[in-house]
Each structure stands twice: as C-alpha cells, then as structure tokens.
Amino acid sequence: MEAFLLENRKPQITTLASGKTLKPATHRLNLPAYTKLIHELRTKTHAKVAISLSTDSQIHMVWVKSGLVFFTPSASHPAYVNFASSNRLTDVPALTKTTFPQSDVKLIETTPLPNDETSHVASFQLVTWMEGALNILNDLSKCAISFINQCEDTFKSGTNLNKELYNRCITAESRDFCNQMKFVLIGRLCYGQTTSPPPIQLYQYGVTPFISSDIICEGAAYRPIDVENYAMNSNHTVSYAPFFVPNETKPGSRIDLIMVNHLKKFNLMFDSWYKTGGSVMVSSRPERTQNEASVSQIMPTSVKHIANEDLTADDGEGSE
C-alpha cells in the first residue's frame, strides 16, 4: 500500500464518511502510473505520446471513443480553470465550473457542455488507441486494479496491518485519487464498455464525486446486490455524448467525437452527470516534488484478485 501514498506538503484536516474529523492528514492516496503519466506528458518524455499543443495555454485531456484527446479549452468551456483568484497560501485554484451539489436523488453538474455550433475548444490533438492511447490506458488500468487488489490483500483479508500504515491509509486525502480512478474508469468505458467492461470495484468511482479513504480501503460504495445488477445491466448504465472540436480543414465546422457523459448507479437510486466528460488538466500548474511514504512492507495473503491483464486491440469496440 505504501506505493500508493504520498506525503502532503501541508497537512490538511481529514473528515471520514461518518462525519468524524481526524487530525490533519499527512498523506494522500495516489495512483503512481497517473503521476508518472502527467510528468512524462509535461516533460515530453513519454515513450508513445508527445503533445504538440502550445504550452502557453491550459492543456486538458479527455477520453473519447476514438482514443485520448488533448485540448486547449476556451474560457467559456466548463473544463477551463481560472487561476486568477488562486489562493497562494493553499495553491487551490478557483474553478469556473460548478461543483456537484449533494442530493438524495441525484448529483448534477449544472454547467452543460456547450452544444452550439462553437466548440469552445481553441485547439486539440487526437491520439488514437493504436497511436498510444491504449498504451496509456493499459498502464493506468493495471495500476488501478493493483491498488484494488492490494486493498483486498490487506484491509479486507483479515491481515494485521502495521498500525502506522493503517492510520496513514484511512486518514489520507482521497479527492485527487478519486478523480484519477474516475479517469481510468472512463477510459475503460470508452475503449470497451461491452467487450471488456471494468470491474465493479473501479466503477464505483464513477457514480459518486468523492469517496473517503476509510471507505476506499475498508469498505465499498456498492452493495453485494449491485454485483448482480452490474452483470445484468452494465451495458445500459453508460450514455455517450459528442465532444465538439473544430474541424481544421473546414473553417467554421466541427468534428463530433464521442465521450462518456452519463453514469448511472447499478441500483438505479441516483444519477451522476459529468458534462465535462471527466476531463483532467495536464499543464498550467507547477509540478510539486513528491515524496513516497516509507513504511514496512506488508506481506499479502492469498485473496482472489481481479484479473489484471493487458488490454489488446481485440478488447476494443472500435472508433466512432
């Protein structure tokens, strides 16, 4: 588990799902493959993909049915981040898009993705699955499933954990981690939602905006009955919508790529809308020096793991 923990530069208060507030969190959960990907994209050292967009503007990335799109959003795009009112003390930017309001019925983002004739994307670069997007998805997916299996090996297997590691894990910050896992999930859905669906343990990150570390490690955001519902209805829990990008060969026209924009919980109790298609930022934020946590190695026990094999060209549903 220590490979998935990073030290916080500044401890922050942690609140568990029960509402109990603990001492300041000194660590945060992290997907190493995601951090490595962002670093390699920024430094142009990735073995398969090189971003050709101008680094003077924000660069975001989003999964679509055809692969991975890197794009520079206009200020009117929901994914655009306004750093003008950033708090220098906390290094937290003010977002132009709204957050997810809590509701017993559904979670809705009120800012819709622009659906008029203007794409609101200044420039873009599409990397198809065969051009390197599948390589990126493979690395992220294997890392995410490794984390899920590690949780099974430790927290859910009855193994006695090192107390220090246990406390670090259940009190760690997890908001960024949830977004990273959600990004992996959406990639899996775009690539092969029917031919190679992601495991239910990964799917849970797409139906809630946030899961606290104690539930991630010790519990789950789904129930046993959801496993059956997922097997029966997984093909109907995702809907897709166009992601508009300008057509570089025809001024004034656009290309409609397909992305995930609607995920529905298996028990059908509430919906979760992601009008930005789950896009994440690649550039325009200074990199932080990360320090991996150093604790004693935990020996795993024999627990049934999720199959963690490479995705292949045969697993994909093809591009649209």
UniProtKB/Swiss-Prot annotation:
The lineage of its organism: Viruses, Riboviria, Orthornavirae, Duplornaviricota, Resentoviricetes. It comes from Lymantria dispar cypovirus 1 (isolate Rao). This is Non-structural protein 5. The gene is S9.
